[in-house]
Amino acid sequence: MNNSTYINSSSENVIALESPYKTIEVVFIVLVAGSLSLVTIIGNILVMVSIKVNRHLQTVNNYFLFSLACADLIIGIFSMNLYTLYTVIGYWPLGPVVCDLWLALDYVVSNASVMNLLIISFDRYFCVTKPLTYPVKRTTKMAGMMIAAAWVLSFILWAPAILFWQFIVGGRTVPDKDCYIQFFSNPAVTFGTAIAAFYLPVIIMTVLYWQISRASKSRIKKGKKEAAQNQDPVSPSLVQGKIVKPNNNNIPTSSDGLEHNKVQNGKTTGESVMENCVQGEEKDSSNDSTSVSVVPSNTKEDEAAKDASQISASQDHLKVENSKLTCIRIVTKSQKGDCCAPTNTTVEIVGTNGDEKQNSVARKIVKMTKQPAKKKPPPSREKKVTRTILAILLAFIITWTPYNVMVLINSFCASCIPGTVWTIGYWLCYINSTINPACYALCNATFKKTFKHLLMCHYKNIGATR
């Protein structure tokens, strides 16, 4: 952000060491700016504490929001108040060292905010477009590395240039009572940084969200089509059913592993089964759903496998005769926190009364899996995340666009933008940090409820709030 383009355009003039505002105007500006700063600080602290105390908010996407809240908190504490001081008294009273430190902090934090938004957009894009491969790589460690990279890169890009430019060129040209970045005295540099720091990221984020929206709509249509197909009569020997399966478990589940359970006489036993089953047809389903395939296996092979695998501490070899083994492979697209990932479960059914018993058990499973599909599921966590991302992207674009439009105009016409308009435009960039926590609360009921519990000091069971 170019926080002193207007001041830079008039830096050659004599600086009046008195406030350009009347006393009543100064009081009004201080009250409004101070209130915005306070709301920004409280709001972003609430975001950070909510993610810390509520385990349902401890997802990869919310860790990115935590990083964004850190940047917004710094803006609320330092940037807003120092810029208010600079505005109301009409000059910079704290000296060149504090000036450069403030500018470095302001630009590093602002750039980190933009990079966090880019990370969030790319993360959601890969979640939606690569649901089978990306969630495996999407770990807390990876998220931490991406967040660290965003902050380190922002620091490298801005801090050294702001702090040491005067030594590189052989002297400081910024007046003592002014505060702006020295290398922004060149309009071409100002124009280029505006393109790189705002317009290019906005274009990338807009394209990504458009792709996310398209992919989400395509998956919804696919899910509806599969749901309609699952209403057809079902044969117990080949079943493909669908259930709505809300999954709030944030612990990553291996997509390669198979859970083996034995169902004997319609009841599940705790024995480990080592035999191999004939793999049935698998059918991918939409988000938060399960595909079920039931395929009867070879009786002779199954009996041989049973003899080799049934081990019990309390029983000798248990021989099951005149029975057939059916393998049901359930392919579930469960959510790893806020991103879909497929998991497999193999259930083995051993019927003691031949085909009739086996078919009865299979029909029960089919009935169990198809019943929840009749109910309208609540909004999935994926939809909440996508909605939150849309809100913060819109807030970012709306609040940052006016200032960056003025930057482009100022590159060609230094006297075309009034000082008051510059100040308002720059303050809008700061207000984005105030709006972000409200976006989280409005788009995510869990954030909203946790905020409420924290503000009302209701700490009991706050960690399990949904």
Curated annotation (Swiss-Prot):
Question: Which residue ranges are recorded for the region named Disordered?
Answer: 223-265, 279-315
Which regions are flagged for Polar residues bias? 228-238, 246-256
Q: Where is the composition biased (Low complexity)?
A: 287-298
Q: Name one GO molecular function term.
A: G protein-coupled acetylcholine receptor activity
**Biological process GO terms, please?**
adenylate cyclase-inhibiting G protein-coupled acetylcholine receptor signaling pathway; chemical synaptic transmission; G protein-coupled acetylcholine receptor signaling pathway; G protein-coupled receptor signaling pathway, coupled to cyclic nucleotide second messenger; presynaptic modulation of chemical synaptic transmission; regulation of heart contraction; regulation of smooth muscle contraction; response to virus
Name where it's found.
Cell membrane; Postsynaptic cell membrane
Q: Which PROSITE patterns match?
A: G_PROTEIN_RECEP_F1_1, G_PROTEIN_RECEP_F1_2
Keywords for the protein's UniProt record, in alphabetical order = Cell membrane, Disulfide bond, G-protein coupled receptor, Glycoprotein, Membrane, Phosphoprotein, Postsynaptic cell membrane, Receptor, Synapse, Transducer, Transmembrane, Transmembrane helix
* GO terms under cellular component: cholinergic synapse; ciliary basal body; dendrite; Golgi apparatus; nucleolus; plasma membrane; postsynaptic membrane; presynapse
| Keyword Ribosomal protein attributed | no
Please give the residue ranges for the topological domain Extracellular.
1-25, 84-100, 166-187, 411-418
Give the UniProt family note: Belongs to the G-protein coupled receptor 1 family. Muscarinic acetylcholine receptor subfamily. CHRM2 sub-subfamily.
What does the further note read? Answer: This receptor has a high affinity for pirenzepine.
Q: What is this protein called?
A: Muscarinic acetylcholine receptor M2
**Species annotation:** Gallus gallus (Chicken)
